[in-house]
C-alpha cells in the first residue's frame, strides 16, 4: 500500500441525491473518473457532468428492476483489490481500481416510519449493493477512501488535494462505515422481529436471546450524577415520538445535567397520566407535589404548596400549554432548575427568560404512556422489562371494606394511585381534591413511608384532611400503616392487596370507618 497513489476513480451511489451534483462537480473538477449506477448517471448526464455508467463498464445490465446493479466482480474486485498484492490479478481481469466509494443506502428507516406502507415497499427498500460496496471499501481502507457521512466529504477533498489522506483518517472513515452498515442491519432486523406478518400473535417474543441497542449522542452534559463524573445524553437512533425528554427542544438556560434529565423524564411521564391541566414537581427522582385542576395556574399553585421546601430547585412538568399567568407565578414563588411543557406561550417565554438559568424545554404534543421496554443497567448486565403502563379501570377493583368510597374519594384514590407509580418504593401518597398533601418516598419499610407522609402533612399545617385518600404502591404487611393513616383523617385507601394479613388490614380499615380498594396490581419502583 502506498499513500502516494493518485486518486483517479470514484464510485458514487447515493439514494439521497441531495448533495449529488455538488459532490460530482468537485470530483470531476479534480479529474476523478465517476462510476455510477443508472439513476445517478442519468442525473449527472443531464447536468453535463462526465460519468461512466457501471453497466457500460461491466458490460452487464441492471436487472430485476434495479435489484441487481453493482454486485459484479469488476466493481467489487476494483474496491477489494490491494494495490501492492493484487495488481497482477487485477490487470489480468481488466479491473479498474476504485479509490473512493461514496454511498448512502435506501431509506428503509424513513419508509418504516411512515404511517402507511406495504410489505413490498419495505422489502424493496432493503439495500443490498450499497452495504456490500461500503463493507468492501472499509475492509480495504488502506487503499480505498469510504464516505458514508457526506459531512466528511469536504475535509477529504482538501486532504486529497494535498495527497495527505493518512491511515488514521482512512481507518476513522472505515470505522464510521462499519457502524453505518451495522446500524442499518440492526434497524432492518428490529423491524423483522417486531412486524413479522406471518407470525401468529402467541408466537411473538419481545425478549430475544440476543439484544442490541443503538443510540446516538444528543449532547454532552455538564456532569453526571455527581460533579466528578463525566456524562453524555444518548437517544434512540430510530425516529422519536414527540412528548418525551429525548425529543424535547431546549430554548433557554444552562446545559442540562444528568440529574436534570432523569428528573424531567419522571416529571413528564407522571404528568402524562392526567387529562385535565396538571402540574408535577419532582426532586431527586420523586414527585414532591402533584395537582390536577381546571386551570393550570391552580394546578401549579397547589402542587407547589403541597411541599414548597422540597419544590425548591425542583423540576416542573406540565401536560398542556404553559401560559403567562402560570409562568409569572413560578417566577414569583420559587427557584426552579427545569420547566418542561408541550408548548409555551410566547409571553410566558419572555417572562421566564428573565431568569436566565432556568432550563426551558418544549417537548411537543404528549400522549399517555404506551407499551414499550424499560432498561436498567447493572454490573456486566442489562435488565429489561415492559413499562409499567397498565390502564386503570375501576371496574377491576375490589372494594373490600364495609364502607364503600364516595365518588369523590374514588376519584382522589385513582389520582393518588397514578402518582404512587412514580414514587420510589416503599411509597405512600396522600391526596385531597386531586392534590398531593403528603408523600412518603423511598423508605425501607411501609410504616416508615406512612410516618413520613404523616410528617409532611403536619409540616404543612393541613388543618382539615378529612376525606383525604392514601395510595400504597404495594400491600400492607401489617395494620400499623392503616392505624397511622387514620390519625390524620384518611378516609379511603387504595392498595394492591395480596398480603397474608389482608384480613387484619381490612379489619383495621373497618374499625376506622375507612373505605379500602384493592387494585390487584403493584407499582414497585426501584
UniProtKB/Swiss-Prot annotation:
EC code(s) of this entry: 2.1.2.3, 3.5.4.10
Keyword Iron: no
Biological pathway: Purine metabolism; IMP biosynthesis via de novo pathway; 5-formamido-1-(5-phospho-D-ribosyl)imidazole-4-carboxamide from 5-amino-1-(5-phospho-D-ribosyl)imidazole-4-carboxamide (10-formyl THF route): step 1/1; Purine metabolism; IMP biosynthesis via de novo pathway; IMP from 5-formamido-1-(5-phospho-D-ribosyl)imidazole-4-carboxamide: step 1/1
GO annotation, cellular component aspect: cytosol
Residue span, MGS-like domain: 1-148
Keywords: Hydrolase, Multifunctional enzyme, Purine biosynthesis, Transferase
Catalysed reactions listed for this entry: (6R)-10-formyltetrahydrofolate + 5-amino-1-(5-phospho-beta-D-ribosyl)imidazole-4-carboxamide = 5-formamido-1-(5-phospho-D-ribosyl)imidazole-4-carboxamide + (6S)-5,6,7,8-tetrahydrofolate; IMP + H2O = 5-formamido-1-(5-phospho-D-ribosyl)imidazole-4-carboxamide
Signal peptide stretch: none
SUPFAM superfamilies tied to this protein: Cytidine deaminase-like, Methylglyoxal synthase-like
GO biological process: 'de novo' IMP biosynthetic process
InterPro entries (UniProt xref): AICAR_Tfase_dup_dom_sf, Cytidine_deaminase-like, MGS-like_dom, MGS-like_dom_sf, PurH-like
Pfam families in the record: AICARFT_IMPCHas (PF01808), MGS (PF02142)
Keyword Transferase: yes
Organism superkingdom: Bacteria
GO molecular function, one term: phosphoribosylaminoimidazolecarboxamide formyltransferase activity
Comment field on protein domains: The IMP cyclohydrolase activity resides in the N-terminal region.
PANTHER family linked: BIFUNCTIONAL PURINE BIOSYNTHESIS PROTEIN ATIC (PTHR11692:SF0), BIFUNCTIONAL PURINE BIOSYNTHESIS PROTEIN PURH (PTHR11692)
Family per similarity comment: Belongs to the PurH family.
Record's protein name: Bifunctional purine biosynthesis protein PurH
